[in-house]
Curated annotation (Swiss-Prot):
Pfam families: Zip
Name of the protein in its database record: Zinc transporter zipt-7.1
GO biological process: intracellular zinc ion homeostasis; positive regulation of brood size; positive regulation of fertilization; regulation of egg-laying behavior; spermatid differentiation; zinc ion transmembrane transport
UniProt-annotated location(s): Membrane
Length: 392
C-alpha cells in the first residue's frame, strides 16, 4: 500500500517541481524585462564584454612584445648607412669581377651567342616572372586575415581598386616598350642609320680585313677601328644601359629601405638581389659586346650602371619613406623598366639569334643544333629568374 502511494505521488511531485522551476525562470525573465534586457541581450553583453577584455589583453601583450623586439631589430643611423652602402657596392662589384673571367670573343662567336641567348631569357624572365608580378601584387598577403572580417562590406570596392591597379601596371609596361622604341628610332636617325643590326656582320668582316692589310700599321689600325667602333655601337646597347641604370636604382631603393627596417631583412634582401643580378649582368655583358663594345668597355659601362644602385640607396636612406618598402614598391618605375626589358629582348637580342646562322656557312643540321642550344640557353635564363622569384 505504501509502495502504491509513492508511485502515485512521484509524478505529481515531479510536475510541481518543473512548474516551480519554470515559474522561477519566468520571474527572472520578467525582472530582466523590467530593466530593459532580455536573455539574448544579456548573452550578447556578456559575450561582447568578455571579447573586449580578450582583445584588450591581446593588444597589450602584442604591444608589449613588439616593444621588446624593436630595439633588437632596429639599427643605428650610422650602421644603416654603412651596411646599406656596403651591400650595394658589394652587389655591384661581384658581377663585374665575374665578367673578367668570361673569354673575349668577337660579335659572332658561338660562346657569345649562347651568353646572348641566356641574357634574352634573363630579361624576359625578369620582366614577366619577377617585376610585373611584383608590381601587380606589391603588398604582403599577411593582411588577408585582418581584412577578412570586412570583406563582405568592401569586396566590390577592393575588386575595382585592384582591377584599376592592374590596368595601370599594364599601361606602364606598354609605355616602357613604346618609349624604348622611340628612343632607339631617334638614335638611329641621329646616327644616320649606321647602328642597324644587319650591319654587324659587315663591321666584323671589315675589322678582320683591316687587321690583315698591313702588319706595319697594326697599332694605328686598331686605334682607328676602336674610334669607328664607338660610332657603330647599336642603339640597343644604350637602351640596355638606361634600363640597367633604372633597374639598379630600384634595387638600391629596396636595399636601403630593408636595412632601415632591420639588419636581418636587409641582408636577406641583399642576398636576393645578388642572386638576381649575377645572371642578369652576364646577359647584359653579352648584349653590350654584341652591340659593338669591347670586353673592357662593356665591363666599364656595367660599372657605370651600378651608380644607379648607389643613387637609389642614398635616396631611400635620405627620405626614409615607409612607402618605399623592403620589396621596392616604386610605382611606375618597375613596370616601365619591365617594358624596356621586353623590348630589348624581343626586338634587339632575339633577332640577332635568328640571324646568327646566316653569317656562317653552316649546314642545316648545324643550324638546327645551334638553334636548339640557343633555346636551351634562353630557358636557362628564364629558369634562373623563376628560381630567384620563388626564393624572394
Amino acid at each position: 500500500m505504501r509502495l502504491l502511494t509513492v508511485v502515485l505521488l512521484l509524478p505529481l511531485l515531479i510536475i510541481c517541481h518543473e512548474h516551480s522551476h519554470h515559474h522561477h525562470d519566468d520571474e527572472g525573465s520578467a525582472v530582466l524585462t523590467k530593466v530593459g534586457l532580455d536573455d539574448h541581450e544579456l548573452h550578447e553583453h556578456d559575450h561582447d564584454h568578455d571579447h573586449d577584455h580578450k582583445i584588450l589583453r591581446w593588444d597589450e601583450k602584442k604591444n608589449h612584445s613588439s616593444h621588446e623586439k624593436v630595439p633588437h631589430s632596429q639599427l643605428s643611423t650610422l650602421k644603416v648607412w654603412v651596411f646599406s652602402l656596403s651591400a650595394v657596392i658589394g652587389i655591384s662589384l661581384a658581377p663585374c669581377t665575374l665578367l673578367f673571367f668570361i673569354p673575349a670573343q668577337h660579335a659572332n662567336g658561338p660562346f657569345l651567342k649562347i651568353l646572348l641567348a641566356f641574357g634574352a631569357g634573363g630579361l624576359l624572365g625578369d620582366a614577366l616572372l619577377h617585376i610585373i608580378p611584383h608590381s601587380l601584387n606589391p603588398h604582403s598577403h599577411g593582411a588577408h586575415d585582418h581584412d577578412h572580417a570586412h570583406s563582405h562590406d568592401h569586396a566590390h570596392n577592393d575588386h575595382s581598386h585592384d582591377h584599376s591597379d592592374q590596368l595601370r601596371v599594364g599601361i606602364y609596361v606598354i609605355a616602357g616598350i613604346l618609349v624604348f622604341m622611340m628612343v632607339e628610332q631617334l638614335v638611329r636617325i641621329i646616327k644616320g642609320g649606321h647602328c642597324h643590326s644587319h650591319e654587324n656582320g659587315h663591321i666584323v668582316a671589315d675589322e678582320h680585313r683591316h687587321l690583315n692589310d698591313d702588319h706595319h700599321h697594326h697599332h694605328n689600325g686598331e686605334k682607328k677601328q676602336e674610334v669607328e667602333g664607338l660610332k657603330d655601337i647599336k642603339a640597343s646597347a644604350y637602351l640596355n644601359l638606361v634600363a640597367d641604370f633604372v633597374h639598379n636604382m630600384t634595387d638600391g631603393l629596396a636595399i636601403g629601405a630593408s636595412f632601415s627596417a632591420g639588419s636581418t631583412l636587409g641582408w636577406v634582401t641583399t642576398l636576393t638581389v645578388l642572386l638576381h643580378e649575377l645572371p642578369h649582368e652576364v646577359g647584359d655583358f653579352a648584349i653590350l659586346v654584341q652591340s659593338g663594345f669591347s670586353k673592357y668597355q662593356a665591363i666599364r659601362m656595367q660599372a657605370v650602371t651600378a651608380l644607379g644602385a648607389i643613387t637609389g640607396c642614398i635616396f631611400s636612406l635620405l627620405i626614409s619613406n615607409p612607402v618605399l618598402s623592403a620589396e621596392g614598391d616604386t610605382g611606375a618605375i618597375m613596370p616601365f623598366t619591365a617594358g624596356g626589358f621586353i623590348y630589348i629582348a624581343t626586338v634587339s637580342v632575339i633577332p640577332e639569334l635568328l640571324e646568327s646562322g646566316d653569317h656562317n656557312n653552316m649546314s642545316k643540321v648545324a643550324k638546327m643544333a645551334q638553334s636548339l642550344v640557343h633555346l636551351i640557353a634562353i630557358c636557362m635564363g628564364v629558369g634562373m629568374m623563376y628560381i630567384v622569384s620563388l626564393v624572394e
